[in-house]
Regions:
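Function-determining surface determinants
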Residues: 26-535
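Basic polycationic patches enriched in arginine
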Residues: 3-4, 19-25
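Residue-level detector of intrinsically disordered terminal segments
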Residues: 8, 20-22, 30
Length: 535
């Protein structure tokens, strides 16, 4: 089935479902924190047995999701659902909140229905609530009446547990999602998930419990909701576009050290988590792998350069992030770099070379992402983003000192890039590679810091960095391709042509990189100078 983009905003609106803002039935406002994990089929029996070691409650949940014929609600990133919970029907509306970590939700308990039939969906039931008024506004200009889009039939096993001063509800969901496509064909997908929701208490207790269950049973974190899976079934979508990094929001300006550190990490996770979810579930899409690697590099920059803003970052997080980044890079080198090199060599009338296509193909990106060590870091980072500041004895930097710290970091990286750019041709291969990595760090840190200084000047600065990063990227790709062909010389002597040809291209790419790097001294004007925070 061909790739199709989902004609909805659910993919972006539900990037990080671990944090949710919910309006309860009494219209009260509360913060809900939850983790959702996918369960490998071979581990389901063990998970269910572990659930049953305490008092459990079994509930059958039959839900009907409705929308207009043109998908007005899905396009607005909203969900309207009728769900039978035991003997009672509940109507729920959900919508994206102010950011990728938030969601509005309002529930109306309709009670048992005569005859057991599902009640009709009525958007007016949510009138007078923020999300309800938004629902009515979307439907006001809709293209037709509400009708069922897809349905779920879930057996839920729930259990409450105590962990580190927290009360957590565990919900094991097993069942199916069903949707009829435009051609009338019935499409189904299995559901096998474990959700952990903080009912009350310290979020660190939830994180510890999520760590324990995910590590013990080989679970992996997923951002893909049942609603999004239903939309995919409805539209026959089997692959979704990779998620790129969103622009850093102006709200970063004025944040103290702890809040800025949390915001930057959350911004990185908003790119990492949806791509990691797809790859862990079996996607081999090269762009998803590529964007996941970009997100990991941005995250490592945040962890390294924002560490001094506030306590709480664990140095042990670095190693699993580096390992997954490296393993995914092996795939990229063969999938992208080799394809580009082969196309260029073919144009140059090079003889075909047996590149041993079976080499490294055993490296499964999904297995790398599902690795317990990597999943443990994701859970810890999600928990860090939801945790309140630490004790008063270890406060983070205030907004002024946080801004000063970023300015010092930017100044240092900027000077290092300029210094090494002047002598790029004299550096060895490892040092040249460090220049490329340092330039990326400078770019990502500049993106995080832009709202704190002069955003327009920062945009100009970043635009000046881009040609240098592109040039160093080409230089690196030439080096990778050269190494791949050099490694094949023993198996196929025809690779010598490629080695010589690529060696010449690599030298030319290095000269171009030095020229572009030297231009930065005059072109890339630091935006962090001066006291003004804005243009």
């Amino acid at each position: 089935m061909p790739r199709r983009s989902i004609p909805v905003k659910l993919a972006s609106a539900q990037l990080c479902e671990h944090r949710v803002i919910r309006i309860a039935r009494g219209f009260g406002l509360s913060m809900e924190i939850e983790f959702k994990f996918c369960i490998p089929p071979e581990r389901l029996q063990a998970v269910e047995a572990a659930m049953r070691r305490g008092a459990v409650r079994r509930t059958r949940l039959q839900a009907h999701y409705v929308d207009t014929p043109g998908g007005a609600l899905a396009a607005a990133g909203m969900v309207l659902r009728l769900r039978l919970e035991g003997p009672r029907w509940v109507q729920t509306v959900k919508a994206a909140g102010d950011g990728p970590l938030q969601r509005w939700e309002h529930n109306v308990d309709l009670g048992p229905q005569a005859g057991g039939d599902a009640p009709a969906a009525d958007p007016q039931r949510h009138a007078g609530t923020p999300v309800g008024d938004r629902l009515l506004a979307v439907l006001r200009d809709a293209d037709g009446p509400l009708r069922e889009s897809y349905a779920t039939d879930i057996e839920r096993l729930t259990r409450e547990m105590r962990s580190g001063g927290a009360t957590v509800e565990l919900a094991l969901d097993i069942g199916r999602i069903r949707a009829h496509g435009a051609d009338g064909a019935l499409r189904e997908a299995q559901v096998c998930e474990l959700e952990l929701e903080l009912l009350r208490g310290d979020v660190r207790g939830l994180v510890a419990l999520a760590q324990a269950w995910s590590q013990r049973h080989g679970l992996w974190f997923s951002t893909v909701s049942k609603a999004e899976r239903g939309e995919r079934l409805l539209h026959g979508v089997v692959a979704v576009p990779a998620v790129k990094a969103a622009p850093v929001p102006p709200s970063f300006a004025g944040l103290d050290g702890h809040a800025l550190q949390q915001a930057a990490i959350a911004h990185c996770l908003a790119q990492i988590l949806p791509n990691a979810s797809e790859v862990a579930a079996g996607s081999s899409d090269d762009e998803q792998v590529h964007q996941l690697r970009i997100g990991l590099r941005r995250l490592r920059t945040a962890l390294r350069d924002l560490d001094a803003l506030a306590p709480g970052l664990d140095p042990a997080w670095e190693a699993p992030l580096v390992e997954v980044f490296r393993m995914l890079g092996v795939r990229r080198d063969r999938a992208l770099v080799l394809a580009q090199a082969q196309a260029a060599l073919e144009t140059a009338s090079a003889p075909p070379v047996d590149m041993g296509d079976d080499a490294n193909t055993s490296d499964d990106p999904g297995a790398a992402v599902r690795a317990p060590a990597f999943q443990a870091v994701l859970v810890a980072l999600i928990g860090h983003g939801a945790a309140p500041p630490g004790p008063a004895t270890t406060p983070g930097l205030d907004a002024t000192d946080a801004r000063r710290h970023l300015r010092d970091r930017l100044r240092r990286l900027h000077r290092q890039v300029l210094r090494d750019g002047e002598r790029f041709d004299t550096l060895d291969a490892d040092a040249q590679h460090r220049v490329r990595k340092r330039l990326k760090r400078l770019r990502y840190l500049a993106e995080f810091a832009a709202p704190l200084f002069r955003p327009k000047a920062a945009a100009r600065y970043l635009a000046r960095l881009r040609p240098a990063q592109d040039s160093l990227g080409r230089f690196n790709d030439e080096a990778v391709a050269l190494a791949l062909y050099r490694a094949r010389v023993g198996q196929d002597p025809r690779a010598w042509f490629a080695v010589g040809w690529l060696q010449a291209r690599h030298a030319a790419a290095g000269a171009d990189a030095q020229r572009v790097l030297r231009r930065l001294r005059k072109k890339a004007m630091p935006f962090w100078r001066g006291r003004k925070a804005r243009d």
